Amino acid sequence: MNLEDIRREYLLGGLNREDLLPNPIDQFNVWLEQAIASGVPDPTAMTLATVSKSGQPSQRIVLLKHLDQRGFVFFTNYRSHKAEDIAGNPCVSLHFPWHFMERQVKVQGEAVKISTAETLKYFLTRPRESQLAAWASEQSQRIDSRKALLSQFEAMKAKFTKGEIPLPDFWGGYVVKPQAIEFWQGGASRLHDRFLYCNENGSWQISRLAP
């Protein structure tokens, strides 16, 4: 297979310093709203990169579920591999690949657990089947078969037949508090536009980076 000639030009337009808002969270909100309006598939899907205690990096796609001035919130099983990595090294990276708009956003920061109250508020908005799945799946653990997973799911359905499904004590959210956010816009002739926001003593500084 020849991969060398697979390429395309980026022609949707550039990004100028004067186009950017002073706060990167506000700027991200603008781009996210534009991605949603443009029909970008799974616009809230983001790659979460973590590093284990031994220095082994791992990546997986998770969904952005809330955004505010603290940072980027996602939810997971606290016994998962990603949670183990975060417990040993809270420094993480997020990546939003909005190919359709010739844009990408990279976030570097620290992942911190959110409160149980905030987790519960979100958990109660999830479909009942998703709540049951949180109980049924021992995330990242080896299992014998899909049949075994479905059997555990049915067992949880039988256990929680009436009323609200309680929040598992091993499931919850993290907020990634950003220290740096990069906005990338594709440009012609590979002369892409890159702007980096860095948090310096509580103030956001913006720099243009070479592509």
UniProtKB/Swiss-Prot annotation:
SUPFAM superfamilies: FMN-binding split barrel (SSF50475). Keywords: Flavoprotein, FMN, Oxidoreductase, Pyridoxine biosynthesis. The keyword ATP-binding does not apply. It is an enzyme of class 1 (oxidoreductase). Pathway: Cofactor metabolism; pyridoxal 5'-phosphate salvage; pyridoxal 5'-phosphate from pyridoxamine 5'-phosphate: step 1/1; Cofactor metabolism; pyridoxal 5'-phosphate salvage; pyridoxal 5'-phosphate from pyridoxine 5'-phosphate: step 1/1. GO terms for biological process: pyridoxine biosynthetic process. It catalyses: pyridoxamine 5'-phosphate + O2 + H2O = pyridoxal 5'-phosphate + H2O2 + NH4(+); pyridoxine 5'-phosphate + O2 = pyridoxal 5'-phosphate + H2O2. GO terms for molecular function: FMN binding; pyridoxamine phosphate oxidase activity. Its cofactor is FMN. Its EC number is 1.4.3.5. Disulfide bonds: none annotated. The keyword Flavoprotein applies. Binds 1 FMN per subunit. It comes from the Bacteria. Substrate binds at R7, R8, E9, Y10, K65, Y122, R126, S130, R190, L191, H192. FMN binds at R60, I61, V62, L63, L64, K65, F75, T76, K82, Q104, Q139, S140, W184, R194. Homodimer. Catalyzes the oxidation of either pyridoxine 5'-phosphate (PNP) or pyridoxamine 5'-phosphate (PMP) into pyridoxal 5'-phosphate (PLP). Belongs to the pyridoxamine 5'-phosphate oxidase family. This is Pyridoxine/pyridoxamine 5'-phosphate oxidase. The lineage of its organism: Bacteria, Pseudomonadati, Pseudomonadota, Gammaproteobacteria, Cellvibrionales.
